[in-house]
Amino acid sequence: MRTFKIIGMLLSYPKQPLIDNMAEIEQVLKSEALLPTRAMKKLLKFTEYVKQSDLYELQEEYVELFDRGHAHCLHMFEHIHGEGRDRGQAMVNLIESYAERGFYMAEGELPDYLPLFLEYLSCCPAEEAIDLIGDPINVVATIGVKLKKRDSLYYILFEAMQSLAKVKADSDVIAAATAAELETQSLEELDVEWAEAEAFDNSTECGSSQVLAYPEQNSAQLSQ
């Protein structure tokens, strides 16, 4: 079930060793043949994109997409529970599930980090992994739709995950989530307009903005 792990690796912060081992990664995907034909072709399109891209540009794109803001956050429970109390219990439950399989996280990692979850699935029996990837399918599908609207090829990874699941995403949930994002973007644009207007008033104070960022996560080696 290394396909799950590979998708998680491709969804992690891009580094040179990943690019250097892309031929091996592609071979594993083909030999395991877990993905449907169409999803496989698209995933190989993504790996080719990674191979042909400048590493620093890939890293810049990754940070812009996944480390800034909420829309494409790779922590699944943030989309489901936000900062609510239920998120903590969901984390505990997931950690316990990991431990039952002898799967333990590195210090500083959060269990709902999607690449980590995919690595865990690679340790599960095939049928169980396919069932479990369906649990966050609405989150996965929503992020994929948002990335596709941004013309980012990273959407291919999210479509690949969907192709592995038995269940289908709820189109109403996806529509509601994308509509909420558009509303949020409109409010942010209004904030920018107000900030620009204040920049030309008589005030001598300068405002500052803060960006919510998530710590870089280390992907496991393919051979493990």
Predicted regions, residues:
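Charged, alpha-helix-forming regions
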Residues: M1-Y113, E119-Q224
